[in-house]
């Protein structure tokens, strides 16, 4: 992921001025990486190493979403709506 794109995502989802690690930012960054890797795997179907990385990222994002759902349901619903995620 390019530096400018990463900074743009952080700016869009940050909760306060110096926020870089909130669950919302982490979920948004993971979603971008997952989408990019999904496109890669459509072309390179036998890239099993990258597929494993994709599954790990999806699991990590799911864990962050579960944490957010347990702690603050309003923030969870907002991030799911913004990123057009299922559930």
UniProtKB/Swiss-Prot annotation:
Superkingdom, taxonomy of origin: Bacteria
Claim: Ribosomal protein is one of the keywords in the record: yes
Gene3D superfamilies: 6.10.250.3130, S15/NS1, RNA-binding
BP terms from Gene Ontology: translation
GO MF terms, alphabetically ordered: rRNA binding; structural constituent of ribosome
GO cellular component: cytosolic small ribosomal subunit
Keywords: Ribonucleoprotein, Ribosomal protein, RNA-binding, rRNA-binding
Assembly information from the UniProt record: Part of the 30S ribosomal subunit. Forms a bridge to the 50S subunit in the 70S ribosome, contacting the 23S rRNA.
Record family assignment: Belongs to the universal ribosomal protein uS15 family.
Function: One of the primary rRNA binding proteins, it binds directly to 16S rRNA where it helps nucleate assembly of the platform of the 30S subunit by binding and bridging several RNA helices of the 16S rRNA. Forms an intersubunit bridge (bridge B4) with the 23S rRNA of the 50S subunit in the ribosome.
Record-given protein name: Small ribosomal subunit protein uS15
């Amino acid at each position: 992921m390019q530096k400018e794109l990463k900074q743009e995502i952080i700016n869009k989802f940050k909760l306060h001025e110096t926020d870089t690690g909130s669950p919302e930012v982490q979920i948004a960054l993971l979603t971008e990486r997952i989408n990019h890797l999904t496109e890669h795997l459509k072309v390179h179907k036998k890239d099993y190493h990258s597929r494993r990385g994709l599954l790990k990222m999806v699991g990590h994002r799911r864990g962050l979403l579960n944490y957010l759902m347990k702690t603050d349901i309003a923030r969870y619903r907002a991030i799911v709506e913004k990123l057009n995620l299922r559930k």
